[in-house]
């Protein structure tokens, strides 16, 4: 799916890590929320409250989940899951990484 229809978008951006990650919250009619964003080349650590599925829209990244030793690579069309109350490191090396974060 390349677009979301019939949604509400929060106009104020979520800006993290001095602008290296910028996203907007999208709310659906059923109350579910997602964020749509971009991560610029960097290595960042994110903490989760709810479980998340990170869908790669464009670009590529490497990810290391909390408690794991190996980095895994993801490209457009792939996704990875992060448990609730956890964290993950993400490395974006070249092109900006475009994503949709599915919560819950």
Swiss-Prot record:
Any GO MF annotation of the entry: purine-nucleoside phosphorylase activity
Record's catalysed reaction(s): a purine D-ribonucleoside + phosphate = a purine nucleobase + alpha-D-ribose 1-phosphate; adenosine + phosphate = alpha-D-ribose 1-phosphate + adenine; cytidine + phosphate = cytosine + alpha-D-ribose 1-phosphate; guanosine + phosphate = alpha-D-ribose 1-phosphate + guanine
A Pfam family assignment: Ppnp
InterPro entries: Ppnp, RmlC-like_jellyroll, RmlC_Cupin_sf
EC number, as in UniProt: 2.4.2.1, 2.4.2.2
Keyword annotations: Glycosyltransferase, Transferase
One GO CC term on file: cytosol
Record function comment: Catalyzes the phosphorolysis of diverse nucleosides, yielding D-ribose 1-phosphate and the respective free bases. Can use uridine, adenosine, guanosine, cytidine, thymidine, inosine and xanthosine as substrates. Also catalyzes the reverse reactions.
Family: Belongs to the nucleoside phosphorylase PpnP family.
PANTHER family: PYRIMIDINE/PURINE NUCLEOSIDE PHOSPHORYLASE, PYRIMIDINE_PURINE NUCLEOSIDE PHOSPHORYLASE
Name recorded for this polypeptide: Pyrimidine/purine nucleoside phosphorylase
Species this chain originates from: Thiobacillus denitrificans (strain ATCC 25259 / T1)
């Amino acid at each position: 799916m390349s677009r979301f229809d019939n949604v509400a978008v929060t106009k104020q951006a979520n800006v993290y890590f001095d602008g290296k990650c910028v996203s907007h919250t999208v709310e659906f009619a059923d109350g579910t929320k997602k964020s749509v964003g971009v991560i610029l080349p960097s290595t960042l650590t994110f903490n989760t409250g709810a479980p998340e599925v990170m869908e790669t829209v464009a670009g590529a990244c490497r990810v290391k989940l909390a408690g794991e030793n190996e980095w895994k690579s993801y490209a457009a069309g792939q996704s990875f899951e992060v448990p609730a109350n956890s964290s993950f490191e993400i490395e974006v090396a070249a092109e900006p990484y475009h994503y949709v974060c599915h919560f819950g």
